[in-house]
Amino acid sequence: MGRRSAAPTSPFGEPRKFDPKFKGPIGKRHCTDVLCCIIFVVVILGYIALGVVAWIHGDPRKIIYPTDSYGQFCGQKGTPNENKTILMYFNILRCASPVVLINLQCPTTQLCVSKCPDRFATYLDMQANRFNNSYWEYYKQFCKPGFDKPRKSITEVLRDEDCPSMIIPSRPFLQRCFPDFSTRNGVLTVANKTEFKDGIGQMRNVTDLRSAANGINNVLDARSVGMKIFEDYASSWYWILIALFIAMVVSLLFLILLRFTAGVFFWIFIIGVIGVVGYGIWHCFWEYDSLKGVPGADLTIYDIGLQTDFRVYLQLRQTWLAFMILLCIVEVIIILMLIFLRNRIRIAIALLQEGSRAIGYIMSTLFYPIITFILIAICISYWAVTAVFMATSGEPIYKVMANKTLCKYADITCIPETFNTTNVTRLCPGAQCTFAFYGGESFYHQYILIFQLCNVFVFLWLVNFSIALGQCTLAGAFASYYWAFKKPADIPACPLFSSFGRAIRYHTGSLALGSLILALVQFIRIILEYLDHKLKASQNSFAKFILCCLKCCFWCLEKFIKFMNRNAYIMIAIYGKNFCTSAKDAFFLLMRNVIRVAVLDKVTDFLLFLGKVFVTGSVGVLAFFFFTRKIPVLTDEAPALNYYWVPLLTVLIGSYLIAHGFFSVYAMCVDTLFLCFCEDLERNNGSSSKPYYMSPNLHRILGKKEILSKKAKR
């Protein structure tokens, strides 16, 4: 007999061989990617140490409380400024914009006061009314502490800024005094006045303050809006929680209904697409036919050239003919895909239905996203607190405040305690050593930017690890369901808890490695976004083009890595191998079933999109009618609101996040069942000695023809 020729080796590896001992996720495992696990633990310890150092050096009061020119906090308990909670600027005209004010970079004396001025006044007026004690008593509260009944000349007082040269009616915002701007008939006013006296007694128009207070009016209006939004939340939070609970119930019901309606939803959509494209073909033909004989309609697109008005092209028969041909091609492609891929589409729909059935047997998986949410919330909180403490780790830096054109020492660093003994006060009359910002010269302060970048990177790593842990845990639970020969009798007890234990005990290193790769790509994308922001004003077109290409490439790379990591975690949950081996096995398995992968991915994406739209839309519509009091039986129950969109928007966002949490479990379930299904087809042939583990529904859809062909190959 002639020797049988060996089958050519597949470039994507050999199919899985039948193993009578294989019953799903293996129990005997060993720790994988130990080195990465050790690095991960060391990084976490270092991250904790960084947080401790930031906690020691940081002082959030620098953000909570405004700081005066002496580096003292306004409103801090136990200090002389305890009752002085607001920061006032002596000469607001020196401030370029509200952003400068908020960032404490305005080159004028800043003083903590108990209240903002409520009238116009100048130091010259005070001197003119020096015999009126009530006038001085009001004005002196805005002077430096201890400055009472001055003997200095007016020039010296204003030069040394012992008192403000003028005060302006102001309102507190962000614990700072801002001019009380308003508009009347389109005219800018302050306290209903359009003119005021400046510090030297000259009349000036209120518009002179515009550069220092541009946008202040909008900011003050935003404060009012913010208070109203807070009131709306206070009166509607109970109903918001009820709406979110309804969203959770609707999401659960949708997942249950998918077992029976997945195919209906998909085929309705396909028929709808075919119908819409068919209508487009008919409409293009109608437009093409109606333009017959119209003067100029027979010109070609080449004849009229490039036109900025697109409507010109719609008056040509050639345009509608091109549209009609294009739509015909699309229609033919869709129909051919349905003809040749119909069986794979049916398998995809059956897997979706099987996913709903699996979740029904392991209901605890629906609540696992809560654990992922808690882990991510902890990561976000720790990152935010660490970032704030690092940002406030600086020591107070004081600089000389003087006229730059007359004083060469302006803006240099100074020490308040010794400033009056230096030559600066003699060479630059009126110069002051005032607080500028927070900084430092130590190693820690010099590398705060590096530490902030490390904070961001480790944050990304931990968040991705939390997501990876959830995916691996869910994959192990759903794999236990699939490889149970008799469902649900053979499903192991507590499959979710067992899978979680295996992932933590054996595969922390593998999950850390996968999340590290993804975190690196995401970190690079953040840097590219920062560079793109910096280059927006640049005229270098080549640099913008290169940056755009890099952003596109890394976006695609991130999507690919997320996809591969997801499938690698499934293989880790089943076989317990290291990350690289699992990723390779998953990739080869997917490539051996590439058409099924594409079909299942699109069908799943579509149905989950429908689910999110259905849950968010249905709950959102219900919330809209309730909060706008358009439900007659609940009119009296609806709270009185300033803005109904406040709770409505909260309900919409919350409903979407809840639906996303439920459907992420469903998507992981379908992906896991799909990989198990592909392996089932490779391992077994449906015979009594090698029976399939798939459900009877999948077995029936697979068809006798494919089963028999597999038996022949075996």
Swiss-Prot record:
TM segment ranges: 34-54, 238-258, 262-282, 321-341, 347-367, 370-390, 456-476, 511-531, 606-626, 645-665
MF terms in GO: antiporter activity; choline transmembrane transporter activity
GO cellular component, one term: plasma membrane
Entry's localization field: Cell membrane
Residue spans, topological domain Cytoplasmic: 1-33, 259-261, 342-346, 391-455, 532-605, 666-711
InterPro entries xref list: Choline_transptr-like
Catalytic activity: choline(out) + n H(+)(in) = choline(in) + n H(+)(out)
Tagged with keyword S-adenosyl-L-methionine: no
Glycosylation-annotated residues: N83, N132, N192, N205
Keyword annotations: Antiport, Cell membrane, Glycoprotein, Membrane, Transmembrane, Transmembrane helix, Transport
Keyword Lipoprotein: no
Extracellular side of membrane: 55-237, 283-320, 368-369, 477-510, 627-644
Gene Ontology annotations of biological process type: choline transport
Membrane topology recorded in Swiss-Prot or TrEMBL: Multi-pass membrane protein
Pfam family, one: Choline_transpo
Function as written in the Swiss-Prot or TrEMBL entry: Choline/H+ antiporter.
Family note: Belongs to the CTL (choline transporter-like) family.
Protein name stated in the entry: Choline transporter-like protein 5
